[in-house]
Amino acid sequence: MLLAIDVRNTHTVVGLISGSGDHAKVVQQWRIRTEPEVTADELALTIDGLIGDDAERLTGASGLSTVPSVLHEVRVMLEQYWPNVPHVLIEPGVRTGIPLLVDNPKEVGADRIVNCLAAYHKYGTAAIVVDFGSSICVDVVSAKGEFLGGAIAPGVQVSSDAAAARSAALRRVELTRPRSVIGKNTVECMQAGAVFGFAGLVDGLVNRIRDDVDGFSGADVAVVATGHTAPLVLPDLRTVEHYDRHLTLDGLRLVFERNRANQRGKLKPAR
């Protein structure tokens, strides 16, 4: 059983994956709030409470964090609480198997890397990956499995909250799909702007990538969405063909397996 930990700016996803290779399957997934000042002890208490008896069946762990301070605590947690469980954390120097054809590879978020790796592995073609999180990342992987770059826009919830915070007449609203693109009250107007506006933003970016990037205009390009807020916008997206809620967890598994294979079938346990 592999423990997968995906730490983002606002929320953290913890998953359990059984099997490996083509037989791997996410059997459990939880979503908890990310606390930037969380300690290793607090993380261990939370995760151990989630996975329960499966803690005794762990054969490996793989994690990433877009919050550097939390990545350190994840490392300490694994070393202290599961010292005999081999682990891989996605950071510079770790083999991901995906070349980063960008100006500064160290700037590329680990989440973007593993998403593109998972999409390329699953579909075997060039791909455009749209991750709906606190930011919307639209990333591009070539038919050779190379990370070409991407575009980053503010996330749906972040943008809606910012509009409410900066405007005296607006308030924070629940993000649900409105009855119409034409709102009949302030709440519906904000919901329409968020849902239909971001659907248009994503479709526009995907279409522009198809038009501007060599090799992406044909039908042999997979367009994949993932992320917690993706289902809110999916019904109104015209360019996205696939939705995979476990894409990042699958990418974490692939990196773990790749590093395990590179060390002749066994990673060194934490010391």
Curated annotation (Swiss-Prot):
Gene name, Swiss-Prot/TrEMBL: coaX
Cofactors, names only: NH4(+); K(+)
GO biological process: coenzyme A biosynthetic process
Assembly notes: Homodimer.
Entry's EC annotation: 2.7.1.33
Entry protein name: Type III pantothenate kinase
Pathway annotation: Cofactor biosynthesis; coenzyme A biosynthesis; CoA from (R)-pantothenate: step 1/5
CDD domains: ASKHA_NBD_PanK-III (cd24015)
HAMAP family to which the protein is assigned, alphabetical: Pantothen_kinase_3
InterPro entries linked: ATPase_NBD (IPR043129), Type_III_PanK (IPR004619)
Chain residues that bind K(+): 131
Organism listed in the record: Mycolicibacterium smegmatis (strain ATCC 700084 / mc(2)155) (Mycobacterium smegmatis)
